[in-house]
UniProtKB/Swiss-Prot annotation:
InterPro entries tied to this protein: Aa-tRNA-synt_II, aa-tRNA-synth_II, aa-tRNA-synth_II/BPL/LPL, Asp-tRNA-ligase_1, Asp-tRNA-ligase_1_N, Asp/Asn-tRNA-synth_IIb, AspRS_core, GAD-like_sf
Function according to Swiss-Prot or TrEMBL: Aspartyl-tRNA synthetase with relaxed tRNA specificity since it is able to aspartylate not only its cognate tRNA(Asp) but also tRNA(Asn). Reaction proceeds in two steps: L-aspartate is first activated by ATP to form Asp-AMP and then transferred to the acceptor end of tRNA(Asp/Asn).
Site description Important for tRNA non-discrimination, residues in chain: G81
One Pfam family per UniProt: tRNA_anti-codon
Keywords of the record: Aminoacyl-tRNA synthetase, ATP-binding, Cytoplasm, Ligase, Nucleotide-binding, Protein biosynthesis
Keyword Cytoplasm attached: yes
Compartments, as annotated in UniProt: Cytoplasm
MF terms (GO), sorted A to Z: aspartate-tRNA ligase activity; aspartate-tRNA(Asn) ligase activity; ATP binding; nucleic acid binding
UniProt subunit comment: Homodimer.
PROSITE patterns: AA_TRNA_LIGASE_II
Species this chain originates from: Thermotoga sp. (strain RQ2)
Enzyme class, spelled out: ligase
Name the UniProt record assigns to this protein: Aspartate--tRNA(Asp/Asn) ligase
One record GO biological process: aspartyl-tRNA aminoacylation
Length: 579
């Protein structure tokens, strides 16, 4: 080894030792007859002292920031009053006898700890990863992964690898396709998840499986998504919903406790899907902001206000929420901004009033009676604001109000976004309508066990034995009890519009396995990137991934995706069409 110690290791007890340190030059200070170097590696920082009479003194003239050097010297205590309590090695310094330049650095486009635009950080990721923030996040990610592995190992789970080159089963997002050179015209797909393989492992008798695995989705990247991501994949045989939730809560609570000293309240709260949509307008609720959605229909039963009357006469709904202490912010201009936002979200507009020395509203002339009833029923206080909307589509109304609630919470009540709001959303509908495909699709995936009592030809009534873990408004995990009976699986395919021939073509290998003994089983997958980002306090998962892609799926470090050699394309019998 070139070094005897790391830059975060030496203490006062090491005084007098001859040591060799290697690292990056973080800072250089020249105080005349003595020069100081702050030498840094991933373990910490050590102050190097170069006296004017030492051979090391002149070498400092050649050094630049971020050069890599080897330092030989002797440990001594810092003079009294010069200790640095902000670093672990702050009691000591190393008096340099020799400095060897291992790699001289050119001027950098930016220096560790600086925060240029994200594109620059991703292009020069090797510089960005030297910062304390990124170092802390990457080490945290490793520790969380180790905690997870230890937890499942103690419970008797086996970590089993599943294939990356598999068959395309186009359900949900698009697959990344990999052409086969040996079988022209045939393609592998990179897995969106190991779903079928982990179920086959249950059929194979491996009753407790987990894997920290890369997954791939070729989808239009919404905010803070990655085309390749890491999930903690879990599957168990002979279990019901309670078993999966208990094991999951044990893992998540242990990760928080051992990685960050945070104790979560176990068991986690559970909210049925319908309740989440009614109260928060989303199946990923963040309850820290309060402001639950309320049904204000009771106040408008006899209203003559035309806009709302028409909605109610058509069977629609009137809902809204109270924003506490928001009156000082709620000017007419702010009201107009919120009204425009609701139109963007698909509603006709917004009605509002506030308690500000009495009821104040642009709509007071027409709705004073209704406003007073709401204020009394909801026990509104001076300074509160009530936001109200109406629509014939209750789902759209809930979603629009839920979005507005969250936007107001994040913009004006960020001080409430502390701690961790952890909950399960359960009792999901099995199907949802896809506008793009103009048909019902499985909300989770078509291998989820339905609640048998609800299984019939009415898509809207079928419920799934599915569950999502939500932390601070982010979906961190999702899973279900799986179908283990072939007749039920065929019924689900039928409801999804898959003919027997199509089902065999896509999933024949899987359905074949159903003939030979399938245990009841269930599982869950956690998004490791999201889990780490929440614990790290980062708003973007890119901050906890060593080499992430941009929002449009580009690796700025390597330039991927990129053109390939024409010869490679010919071997694969692929031709690129222009336009």
């Amino acid at each position: 080894m070139l070094r005897t110690h790391t830059c975060g290791e030496l203490r006062a007890a090491d005084e007098g030792k001859k040591v060799k340190l290697c690292g990056w030059v973080d800072r250089i200070r020249d105080l005349g007859g003595v020069r100081f170097i702050d030498l840094r590696d991933r373990y910490g920082e050590t102050q190097i002292v170069c006296d004017v009479n030492s051979k090391a003194y002149s070498v400092v003239d050649e050094l630049t920031r971020e050069s890599v050097v080897l330092v030989e010297g002797t440990v001594r205590k810092r003079p009294e009053g010069t200790e640095n309590p902000n670093i672990e090695t702050g009691e000591i310094e190393v008096v340099a006898e020799r400095i060897e330049i291992l790699s001289l650095a050119d001027p950098l486009p930016f220096y560790p700890g600086e925060t240029p635009k994200e594109e620059m950080r991703l292009k020069y990721r090797y510089i960005d990863l030297r910062s304390e923030r990124m170092k802390r996040n990457i080490i945290l990610r490793y520790r969380i992964s180790k905690i997870i592995r230890d937890y499942f190992d103690e419970l008797g789970f086996l970590e089993i690898e599943t294939p990356f080159l598999t068959k395309s089963t186009p359900e949900g997002a698009r697959d990344f396709l990999v052409p086969s050179r040996l079988r022209p015209g045939k393609f592998y797909a990179l897995p969106q998840s190991p779903q079928l393989f982990k179920q086959i492992l249950m059929i194979s008798g491996f009753d407790r499986y987990f894997q920290i695995v890369r997954c791939f989705r070729d989808e239009d990247l919404r905010a803070d998504r990655q085309p390749e991501f890491t999930q903690v994949d879990v599957e168990m045989s002979f279990v019901d919903v309670e078993d999966v939730l208990n094991v999951s809560e044990g893992m998540v609570s242990r990760v928080f406790r051992e990685s960050s000293g945070i104790d979560l309240k176990v068991p986690f709260d559970r909210i049925p899907y319908d309740e989440a949509m009614e109260k928060y307008g989303t199946d990923k609720p963040d309850r820290r902001y309060g402001m639950e959605l309320r049904d204000f229909g009771y106040a408008f039963e006899t209203t003559e206000f035309k806009v709302i009357r028409n909605v109610l006469d058509e069977g629609g709904s009137v809902k809204g929420f109270i924003v506490p202490g928001f009156a000082s912010e709620m000017s007419r201009k702010k009201g107009e901004e919120l009204m425009e936002r609701m139109k963007e979200l698909g509603l006709g507009g917004l009605i509002w009033f506030k308690l500000d020395g009495g009821i104040t509203s642009p709509h007071l002339k027409h709705l004073e009676k209704e406003f007073r009833k709401i204020a009394e029923t909801e026990n509104m206080n001076e300074g509160d604001v009530c936001l109200i909307a109406a629509h014939t589509d209750r789902n759209l109304l809930n979603e629009a109000l839920g979005t507005l609630r969250l936007e107001i919470g994040k913009e004006h009540f960020s001080h409430l976004a502390k701690g961790f709001d952890v909950l399960w959303v359960v009792d999901f509908p099995y199907f949802e309508w896809s506008e793009e495909e103009e048909r019902f699709v499985a909300r989770h995936h078509p291998f989820t066990m339905p609640v048998l009592e609800t299984l019939g030809d009415d898509y809207t009534k079928v419920r799934a034995k599915a569950y999502d873990l939500v932390i601070n408004g982010y979906e961190v995990g999702g899973g279900s009890i799986r179908i283990h009976r072939r007749d039920i699986q065929e019924k689900i395919f039928e409801l999804l519009g898959l003919s027997e021939e199509e089902a065999q073509k896509k999933f024949g290998f899987f359905l074949e396995a159903f003939r030979y003994g399938v245990p009841p089983h269930g599982g869950i997958a956690f998004g490791l990137d999201r889990l780490v980002s929440i614990i790290a306090g980062e708003s973007s998962i890119r901050e906890v991934i060593a080499f992430p892609k941009t929002g449009n799926g580009v690796c700025l470090l390597t330039g991927a995706p990129a053109e390939v050699d024409e010869r490679q394309l010919r071997e694969l019998r692929i031709r690129i069409e222009e336009g």
